[in-house]
Swiss-Prot record:
InterPro entries: Ribosomal_bS16 (IPR000307), Ribosomal_bS16_CS (IPR020592), Ribosomal_bS16_dom_sf (IPR023803), SAP_dom_sf (IPR036361). PANTHER family: 30S RIBOSOMAL PROTEIN S16, SMALL RIBOSOMAL SUBUNIT PROTEIN BS16M. Residues 85-108 are annotated as: Disordered. This is Small ribosomal subunit protein bS16. GO terms for molecular function: structural constituent of ribosome. Keywords: Ribonucleoprotein, Ribosomal protein. The gene is rpsP. One of its GO terms (biological process) is translation. Coiled coil: none annotated. It comes from Leuconostoc mesenteroides subsp. mesenteroides (strain ATCC 8293 / DSM 20343 / BCRC 11652 / CCM 1803 / JCM 6124 / NCDO 523 / NBRC 100496 / NCIMB 8023 / NCTC 12954 / NRRL B-1118 / 37Y).
Length: 139
């Protein structure tokens, strides 16, 4: 199910008032929605915007896509910047854990190829015809 964060029009004729809602992308603009996460009143001066930041960040983390107008509202409120920081902050952590895993010393359970890869990473010289026991001795 593709989920969108978009505006649901409320208010009277020529007096728009919008709710920021989480909805299935296939549902109509003013149709069924999953959750209300804010409001937007473009008539008031300045425009009145109320957003539930925690809920929006949660839905963005789950893959919800904001509409163009909602994207602008979130960007002006600074929510998209926080989401992008948290999203990019997670990626280097994953890379660090993979480096740590590859830096562990090999044991008897590792294959010869894994031991050779470890020795190559460490810069240790070995003969290509060396046996597993000889390679483990170099570690």
């Amino acid at each position: 199910m593709a989920v969108k964060i978009r505006l649901k029009r409320m208010g009277a004729k020529k007096r728009p008032f919008y709710r920021v809602v989480i909805a299935d992308s296939r549902s109509p603009r003013d149709g069924r929605f999953i959750e209300t996460v804010g409001t937007y009143n473009p008539i008031s001066q300045p425009a009145e915007i109320k957003l539930d930041e925690e809920k929006i960040l949660s839905w963005l983390g789950n893959g919800a896509q904001p509409s163009d107008t909602v994207r602008n509202l979130l960007s002006n409120a600074g929510i998209l910047a926080k989401y992008n920081e948290s999203k990019s902050g997670k990626k280097p952590a994953k890379k660090a854990t993979t480096k740590e895993a590859s830096a562990k010393k090999p044991t008897d359970k590792n294959t010869v190829a894994e031991i050779k890869a470890y020795l190559d990473a460490q810069g240790t010289a070995y003969t290509s015809s060396a046996k597993k026991a000889d390679l483990l001795a170099l570690v």
